[in-house]
């Protein structure tokens, strides 16, 4: 099952009404002038019909070597969806790539072929690296990412601020975005140490010409602090619950459409 969750530009939503954000934050993209990003979230459905979190099934899939196949399936779905959008659409999708896929040369060939054959504007596709495990060989990962960047694909370093997504990865990996790890965002209102750390991360990322996405935003106070701090975008249940991809009228997001930079 594929769900999607909005990643909202802070410039568009910092003065928004809290009730509107809680109701359907993604609709605020309609009045925005920038890129409208959505993260694709994969969920398994159990025999009882309940959704199973990636924290449960991803480690199992990694152990049995299934993650490259799962990643390829999700990428295929993303490309098919993007191919249905108008040429002037502002919508971009972010898709998680597993460590196993980053180390697999055959996956690189298959993904490159899928992208080249899709006919989509490749900058609309953003791969997030490092969700649940440490990036294995930085050399292999960098080579993988550089090959896809030549096709126009962009990359985000996920969970930045954890032991796995470290500052050294900004030196070695060709990324365009950093996503600040959610536990640092969740405690912003109580922890001056976390506020200092997040502010430093934002400054570092911008000095490297990277955009900053804050994850797990759960209050209006946190949202406005992040906007004042200079973070570029925010994501979290406060801004929009994950919904099925087909439930969102993405064509409505072509209002005041601009090209994806």
Predicted feature locations:
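PAS and PAS-like sensory modules
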Residues: 2-6, 92-94, 235
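A short, well-structured catalytic beta-strand-centered motif of the EAL phosphodiesterase domain
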Residues: 3-58, 78, 176-178
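EAL-family c-di-GMP phosphodiesterase catalytic domain
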Residues: 15, 24-31, 43-49, 98-105, ...
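Catalytic core of bacterial c-di-GMP phosphodiesterases, primarily the EAL and HD-GYP domains
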Residues: 29-39, 45, 64-140, 216
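Structural preference for long, well-ordered alpha-helical segments in enzyme cores
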Residues: 40, 56, 60-61, 70, ...
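Catalytic-core regions built around general acid/base machinery
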Residues: 111-114, 143-151
């Amino acid at each position: 099952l594929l769900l999607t969750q909005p990643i909202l530009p802070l410039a568009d939503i910092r003065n928004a009404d809290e009730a509107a954000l809680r109701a359907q934050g993604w609709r605020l993209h309609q009045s925005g002038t920038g890129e409208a990003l959505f993260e694709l979230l994969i969920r398994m459905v159990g025999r009882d019909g309940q959704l199973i979190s990636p924290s449960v099934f991803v480690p199992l899939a990694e152990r049995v070597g299934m993650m490259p196949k799962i990643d390829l399936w999700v990428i295929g779905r993303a490309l098919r969806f993007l191919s249905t959008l108008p040429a002037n659409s502002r919508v971009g999708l972010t898709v998680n790539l597993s460590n196993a896929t980053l180390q697999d040369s055959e996956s690189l060939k298959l993904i490159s072929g899928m992208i080249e054959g899709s006919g989509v504007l490749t900058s609309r596709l953003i791969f997030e690296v490092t969700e649940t495990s440490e990036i294995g060989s930085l050399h292999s990962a960098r080579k993988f990412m550089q090959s896809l960047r030549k096709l126009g694909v962009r990359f985000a370093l996920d969970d930045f601020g954890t032991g796995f997504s470290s500052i050294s990865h900004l030196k070695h990996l060709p990324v365009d975005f950093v996503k600040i790890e959610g536990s640092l965002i969740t405690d912003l209102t109580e922890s001056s140490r976390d506020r200092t750390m997040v502010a430093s991360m934002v400054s570092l990322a911008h000095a490297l010409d990277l955009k900053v996405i804050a994850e797990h935003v759960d209050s209006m106070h946190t949202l406005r602090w992040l906007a004042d701090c200079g973070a570029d975008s925010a994501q979290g249940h406060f801004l929009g619950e994950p919904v099925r991809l087909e439930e969102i009228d993405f064509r409505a997001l072509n209002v005041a459409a601009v090209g994806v930079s």
